[in-house]
Amino acid sequence: DSVYTSTKEQVLTNMSAITEELNSLSPDIILLQEVDEKSSRSHKINEASIIKDELPSYNSSYAYNYKTLMVPYPIPPIGQVASGIMTLSTYPVSTACRIKLPCPFSYPIRLCNLKRCLIVSKVPIDGTNKELVIVNLHLEAYDSGEGKAAQTKMLADILQAETDKGNYVIAGGDFNQTFSNTDISAYPQQSDELWAPSLIDISEFGNNFTCITDSSDPTCRSLDKSYDDADDKFQFYVIDGFI
């Protein structure tokens, strides 16, 4: 009955648990997606600011991929959205750039839809003229397929261009697709009515890259029913990973 999945208090509780978990893991690099800055759905809580404040030892970069004053659907509507992807690093970052990805949607739908992008961060490697290139991504989900293909190709081209320079690359995030080398037999498609991710043929990235996911746990689940007493009834997916 509502697009608001949590109360304001619950969002703050969730953010506290998220930042506590990130601090306990103490990773060198963190790649986050769907971080709201000022969105009605999260009660306009600045999640990016909370993450920065609670992880003070990290430098950070943030890029919008969803920014609109009004999403007019469904009923009641989603409303205002200001959301993006966020990269945090314990290593000094020399540059961080937002790279625009191809948008498969036309006017007027594109006005209130996501504008997918990458954050490309570069870390100088001491004693060399090389860099570690970190790519944070969140690729298309609900298009007919052309957008995913175009965005995946652009990602592959960027990774290849950086390795051609002699740099090292790590790309990670939400591909909204499943790598062809991932065993998803534990998560069969339950219904043709539910969203199904397409496959990324990892051979498209060539032999110089390794595509990795951990399929021992799903990284996504459907939102077609209430969470209560339904843990074993959802459609599960493995759509997040690293290159």
Feature roles, as predicted:
Residues 1, 18-44, 88, 121-123, ...:
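Active-site beta-strand/loop signature of hydrolases that rely on acidic residues for catalysis
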Residues 1, 33-35, 63-66, 89-91, ...:
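Active-site-proximal beta-strand/loop segments in catalytic clefts of secreted hydrolases
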Residues 1-73, 77-82:
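N-terminal, active-site-proximal structural segment of metallo-dependent hydrolase catalytic domains
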Residues 3-8, 35-37, 101-111, 137-146:
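Surface-exposed cleft-lining segments at the edges of enzyme active sites
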Residues 23-24, 53, 78-81, 112-115, ...:
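Extracellular/periplasmic catalytic domains that process cell-envelope and extracellular macromolecules
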Residues 52-56, 80-96, 124, 204-205, ...:
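Conserved beta strand-loop-helix elements of the APE1-like EEP
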Residues 81-95, 112-137:
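Beta-strand-turn-beta hairpins that frame and shape the catalytic cleft
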Residues 143-243:
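Metal-dependent phosphoesterases centered on the DNase I-like endonuclease/exonuclease/phosphatase
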